[in-house]
Every structure is written in structure tokens, then in C-alpha cells.
Amino acid sequence: DEYKRRIAAAYYSKRVGQVVHRLATKSFDYAIVMRPDLLEMETLNEVLRVANKTTAYQWDGLERFPQVFEVIPLFDRFFVFDPNDAPKYKAKYPNLLACTNFYFDFPMPEVQVNPNEVMYAGAYQEGRVGSLLKMVDELQKYNLKLNVHLVLGWRSVAFEHPIITFSKKGVGFLSYLETARRAGMLLDIKACEHDGLSFRVFEALRYNKKLITDNKSVRLYDFYRPENIFVVEDGCFDGLSEFLAAPYTPLPEEIIQKYSFTNWLRYALDMPPYQVTDSKTWKFQLS
């Protein structure tokens, strides 16, 4: 898997390099690099050269891909989403800032929602499968429609399951969003290597969905409401029945807008007005 990941990263870096090379004679006010660890240094230097202000966003734990530490000092602003990384490395890397993932706030047509449907779609990762199976097994005890899909990529089908479906390729983002919006609840499985919140958390926030997650760090955020987000901790599902029966509690629009891509982009580029997107543990940034 590691070898294939490197091949994919090299291909991605090459494609980005080709685009940047065509822009070599131009200059830009800003450049934002998502997952800078995936770019080769030659490509990254090309990006940095054509922009006046540079921002990077690592939507993975820093220690999961440690090669990223080499490029942090190259950027004006370097954002991390794991609530453990900013406090841990801020002293060494002064340009390090905390933020979260986001949801895309472009308009979407209304859809018919099935409040009893629970949806999960994601890439197959060995470290997440055990937690996913436990959640699915527990949810099968209730009168729910479970829509659970794993994308295998280059892997073979790992096992058969009466609920979980598999495919080699994922669907387009808009198709995924439409499926997610039709569900009443979303599932979220934490990656073992970090405590950052996935995009699913913010999709649930944007579309007023209940969320079932095993990422307990979600409790640190201002949008957390126990009636909207059920946290599976140490494999314990106590209180799930009451959670499923309770109605969703709408959140203030100000909180919802805080986690939009529009606000995220203004924060990333330091273009006020914006709201800082952080957890309750990151308030040192505001001082």
C-alpha cells in the first residue's frame, strides 16, 4: 500500500507541476496548497515562486506523514486540523495555525430526506474497519435503513457483508453529496493516526443531519450538541436508543456559517472578516 501511495503521489505532483509550469511567467496574490506533503520539492518551489502570499493546509495528522515537517517553514501560514498538532508544534513552527475541515456552501436543490436512513461512504482503511463493523452491527438492531459503502481502490474485496457494499472506484463528489443529503444520519469513523474531524462532520452540520462518530474530540467544538451528535467511546453504545428517538436541534446560523468553505478560505488567506475555526482547546491563537 505504501509503494502504491508513493506512485500516486508522484503522479499527482507531476500533474500539478505541469500546470504550474504553464503559469511560470505569471504572478499571483495567493497560493493555497492542500496536502503539501504530496508534492515533490521541485513542484512545491514552483508554486511558492509565483505567489506573493502562501498558505498550506494539512488535513491529516502531521505525524502520520512526517515528511510534511520539512515544508512547514516554507509557507507564510500553515494550517493543521488535528487538535493535538497546533499546541504541540507551535513553538517550533511559529507560522503554524489551527483550523478545521469545512463544508462547501454552494447552493443545492432540496431533496427528500429519509430520517431513518444512516449513510456512510469512504475509502477502505484497515484501521477503521473494526469500528465500522461494530457500528453497523449495533445499528442493525434498530429499524433503520443502512447505506454503507467502501471504496477499495487497488485492493481486493476483503470480506462479504450483508449491509456493506464495495466498489473499486468512488462516485463523484456531487453524487456523494446527494446521497448523503437524502439520509437522516451520517456515520463517521475516526482515523487511528489523528484526532482531526473529517469532512463528514461538517456535512452533517451543513445539512442538519444527526451524526454518529467514534471521534470523541468532536466534543471540543462549539457546534457539539449531545442530541445531535452521538459519540461512541470505547465501543460503548449506551444511550443510542434515546439519541435515535430524539429530534435534531437546529443550531444558530452563525455557528453553521463559521464552518463554511467561504469562511474557511477567508481565514486561510487572512482576509477579514472571518471567524477562526478551531476547537475549544485552541484559544491561545486568539490572544
Question: What are these model-derived regions, one by one?
Answer:
Residues D1-F28, M34-T43, W59, E70-S198, ...:
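Nucleotide-sugar donor-binding catalytic core of glycosyltransferases
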Residues A246-N263:
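A short, well-ordered alpha-helix in the C-terminal region of glycosyltransferases
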Residues L220-G235:
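Nucleotide-sugar donor-binding patch of glycosyltransferase catalytic domains
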Residues L48-Q58:
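Short beta-strand/loop segments at the ligand-binding rim of alpha/beta enzyme cores
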Residues V231-L251:
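C-terminal "capping" alpha-helix adjacent to the active site of nucleotide-linked donor transferases
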Residues N45-E46, R64:
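Catalytic alpha-helical scaffold of carbohydrate-active enzymes acting on polysaccharides/glycoconjugates
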Residues A180, A204-L205:
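Short alpha-helix at the nucleotide-sugar/activated-sugar donor binding site of glycosyltransferases
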